[in-house]
């Protein structure tokens, strides 16, 4: 357990030596963000954030706004949930991390799919994909939020990039906000052993 100040100090030395350009953190909590930032300004924080997982809004995003730190949400498509490609009968292979995540166990997945139905209403009205709605919603939150959706297929990359052209109006954003808040996410983010490694 190395104090975060020591980590930040080492990164500061690397930046001053020209070996590193910026200091980023991942899955850090508010206390560690503040402590690290006091030693070496943090450029960006990476953590999960999407219509499916809005926990960073409670404490993380206000601190990032206060300190001028960018936010890089991973899993902005809710690990595939927000693409509309999953069903209650979806089975995940042994190499798929979702096979280990409580949110994607059969009962939890069935309950969590209620959010997809609500997002689909906006997608159909706008003539775009569910994934584009989810990414456009993130892009509309703050100019310093830059999601990093992952894909292995060119057509999905092109679809994801298309989200930058989507304009969600105030009514769309309010509808998505209400939809997201109306569905209580079932299942923990990670199994207990993995969850303990996260700084919050």
Which residues fall in each region the model found?
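Beta/alpha (TIM)-barrel catalytic core signal, keyed to glycine-rich beta->alpha loops juxtaposed to Asp/Glu
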Residues: 1-178, 193-200
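Secretory-pathway/luminal and periplasmic proteins that interact with or process carbohydrate-rich
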Residues: 141-142, 182-186
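Conserved PLP cofactor-binding pocket of PLP-dependent enzymes
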Residues: 187-192
